A protein has these predicted regions:
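Soluble extracytoplasmic regions of secretory-pathway and membrane proteins
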Residues: 2-458
Length: 458
């Protein structure tokens, strides 16, 4: 099991946004008898397997396109997944011993299981009686000492949750709450953004907003930099730290304290650098502060005449989200982070702020603001227009009455030329079958025009 990650890949020569998820091992989903078996849970079910990937743009009423699918892994689109074993991930893990005499279950195939033997360098070798005794005491499990199924190559693999491992190794870095997996020809890798913090930056306002507690708990700071990108090998568990902001004095101090720990960004393999992105939490902090400090006129600033806020939706604030558009360069699709903003206490759209994620524009912030007197409909007003459209409302009501639940997906705000396009996906969830929401319609709005169809192209 794993959460859904958003990224961009070049698939069949087309640069496009995708959704992908790692197939991590979830021992709790095994039958109870298998969970209770020490051999099953410690020697055989040792790792997850591969990823699934779909394009972000899919049409309603059409079969799902899979860039990467199935077990064993298949890709009809040439997407490479090297070494698919996932021994290190985001989930809850317990120690395992690999390789071993029984063999590890890699993946099912037909009515049998394909077996494998771990060849990585993760964990600690169990190559002596002393080590077996020490680990048996450490984990409170005598089976580690008494088992006869280990070999001279066996390793005990623990702390597979790489987030916890990073926090143990470098507790002075704050970690982004949404690491993501990347598939390459060399294997699967996790990318984790990390921050340096301080509460002692002179003449700087502390970060304290309605959203801050949800993202950072009770942390107090008035300085934050996304100075480190961390790469974790999902097979070996190798953790590599790369400095993404060399101008940060705090990260340079850590570099001097721990020589060899922090590498230059240029040392990151190019196949991974293509997937580095501007982090959401960092951009959310910036937008929370910029929503007031964009006002350069002192009178307007103190009167708070043009304060902004995140747009409020029925599910909460509309926080920054990733898109792939040719907005920054008409000749080229780019992966960007978008944050629509509204005037404080009002529903209309006031600005679109965009952060570049690709190398050429990485970290550059672009602000598209609309004149204060111009009323540009915001997402909440678009929802009201949708509800007022009799044809759309009638069709949605029919679906509801037919035993399906209509679900409004997350609205997307797209700048197109000199206008704003709103895209509202509509999902149906069956009340009788497996409750997986299915994309059925796309509602598009521009100005006061609202249209519903099966796909965005229609």
């Amino acid at each position: 099991s794993s959460d859904l990650d958003v990224d961009r890949y070049t698939v069949e020569g087309i640069y496009q946004q995708v959704y992908l998820a790692a197939r991590e091992l979830n021992i709790e989903k095994l039958p109870p008898a298998a969970q209770e078996s020490w051999v099953n849970s410690r020697l055989q079910y040792t790792h997850g397997y591969g990823v699934v990937m779909t394009p972000a743009v899919q049409g309603g009423d059409e079969p799902i396109t899979w860039f990467v699918r199935d077990i064993p892994i298949q890709s009809d689109f040439g997407v490479k997944v090297g070494r698919p074993g996932i021994y290190y991930g985001e989930g809850k893990y317990q120690y395992v011993i690999a390789p071993n005499e029984i063999g590890e279950i890699d993946h099912p195939q037909g009515n049998t299981n394909v077996m494998t033997d771990y060849t990585g360098g993760g964990g600690v070798p169990l190559d002596s009686i002393l080590r077996k005794i020490l680990f048996a005491v450490y984990f409170g499990d005598r089976n580690i000492f008494f088992t006869t199924k280990t070999t001279s190559e066996s390793r005990i693999i623990f702390r597979q949750n790489f987030v916890e491992a990073i926090q143990i190794i470098t507790p002075f870095f704050l970690l982004e709450n949404d690491p993501y997996i990347v598939t390459t020809s060399d294997g699967l890798f996790w990318i984790q953004d990390a921050y340096t913090l301080s509460n002692y930056y002179p003449y700087s306002q502390p970060y304290d907003t309605d959203i801050s507690e949800r993202m950072f708990g009770d942390l107090n700071f008035n300085y934050i930099r996304n100075s480190v990108k961390i790469v974790v090998d999902a097979y070996n568990g190798d953790i590599r730290y790369y400095i993404s902001n060399p101008a940060d004095p705090i990260v340079q101090a850590y570099r001097r304290i721990y020589p060899g720990l922090l590498k230059d960004m240029e040392e990151m393999p190019q196949e991974l650098r293509k997937h580095v992105r501007y982090p959401k939490q960092y951009f959310t902090v910036q937008m929370s502060m910029f929503s007031r400090y964009h006002q350069v006129n002192p009178i307007l600033f103190y009167q708070e005449e043009d304060d902004w806020e995140f747009i409020e939706m029925n599910y909460g604030p509309l926080l920054p989200y990733y898109l792939t558009l040719n907005l920054l360069n008409p000749q080229k699709q780019e992966f960007i982070l978008v944050s629509p903003m509204s005037p404080t206490g009002r529903d209309n759209l006031r600005s679109l702020v965009i952060a570049g994620c690709d190398e050429e524009n990485y970290g550059k912030i672009f602000v598209y603001s609309f004149p204060k007197g111009e009323q540009i409909f915001g997402p909440a007003q678009i929802i009201a227009l949708i509800n007022q459209d009799t044809a759309i409302a009638q069709e949605l009501t029919l679906w509801d009455q037919a035993g399906s639940r209509v679900i409004f997906g997350k609205m997307i705000v797209l700048p197109i030329g000199n206008s704003i396009l709103y895209v509202q996906p509509i999902y149906l969830e069956s009340a009788y079958r497996l409750k997986i929401p299915e994309l059925r319609r796309i509602i598009v709005s521009q100005g006061d025009l609202v249209v519903m169809d099966r796909t965005l192209e229609d």
